[in-house]
Amino acid sequence: MVTVEEVRNAQRAEGPATVLAIGTATPSNCVDQSTYPDYYFRITDSEHKTELKEKFKRICDKSMIKKRYMHLTEKILKENPNICESMAPSLDARTNIYAVEVPKLGKEAAEKAIEEWNQPKSRITHLVFCTTTGVSMPGADFQLTKLLGLGSSVKRFMMNQLGCFAGGTVLRLAKDLAENNKGARVLVVCSEITVVTFRGPNDTHFDSLVGQALFGDGAAAVIIGSDPIPNVERPLFELVSAAQTLLPDSKNSICGELREIGLTFHLLKDVAELISNNIEKSLVEVFQPLGISAWNSIFWVAHPGGPAILNQVELKLGLNPEKLGATRHVLSEYGNMSSASILFVLDEMRKSSTQKGFDTTGEGLKWGVLIGFGPGITFETIVLHSVSTQGSFGIRDWDYNFGIEFKIIFIPYLVLGIS
């Protein structure tokens, strides 16, 4: 008779979770940041608020954003005038748009990831869908299974209202699913549109004005699985370890509330300082087992929360300017897309590494970090292990060495409960 331990061992994958494919999508409507203040104050019938408009222009000028993509076109906004008001009841109109467009945009990203993966959709065993845009039942996860034609037995997980750190959360969940379910292939989708946060300017809600200058629309999808099939599946990154950290006494620094007027966004002035002063604690937690403490020796996949946060993190950790290059590129080209942002950065990291001639997907480096932050303040930190960019498929020659490193370095920490 078999033992429970034997059953469990048979259920688990042998190797670490890997990123097997990445896909991204945006709405077709692109807005230029340099002309956005004029458009925003015109479409919201707020051109008489000249002082506020000048403040908004300065925010946009300092945002380090060149352009963003938005589903809300001028036509849609004119058809839904309450969305343009600062405090008008408009949740019904916003929900009608969200319920259709969030799964639809997610489908575009998912199809690109599946195309890169180049495997039949029937091999997808789990679906994790994440959005901060809204809530419905059945959720966007259900809608996406129908849009993609996934099997009825796919195990679904729906995550709502987590905010900007959620791109790390879904990867942490997908890692656990892949490593504890032999043969699992997890489709992860983050889809965000600004339909619930867009509103007209208000003199008493300056933090909302900051959000209007930063947030954009986008969806990203990744396929996660352990033990990739040699010569069939090509890993892009390995997910080595993951941690979540909650910063004490910071719950009101970043927060949002879903109300009749939509999702209200609150951002305190001390957010950049709080994040930069505490980010190293999260790094030490996951990299101490590896003996890594030089933050310029790893590649960086960081959430593009905003220029002030990136500048202070760079200064506090003494990072070389190029370390946050992929993050700054995504911020410049797309803005802050909440949960989807960090997956865009992951995609940019692997693409730019190849384009620049590096020999790994992590800018020629072996180890890297994916770090997200958002409401809580919550940090999601994942240790990444890059792979070769030389075109080899499946398990690489040095995967064996990585397995030895993992057992020697990490297992004692896990057994002893050291973090």
From Swiss-Prot:
Record keywords, A-Z: Acyltransferase, Flavonoid biosynthesis, Transferase
PROSITE patterns: CHALCONE_SYNTH
GO-annotated molecular function: naringenin-chalcone synthase activity
Pathways per UniProt: Secondary metabolite biosynthesis; flavonoid biosynthesis
Catalytic activity, reaction form: (E)-4-coumaroyl-CoA + 3 malonyl-CoA + 3 H(+) = 2',4,4',6'-tetrahydroxychalcone + 3 CO2 + 4 CoA
UniProt record similarity statement: Belongs to the thiolase-like superfamily. Chalcone/stilbene synthases family.
Name of the protein described by the UniProt record: Chalcone synthase D
Protein source organism: Petunia hybrida (Petunia)
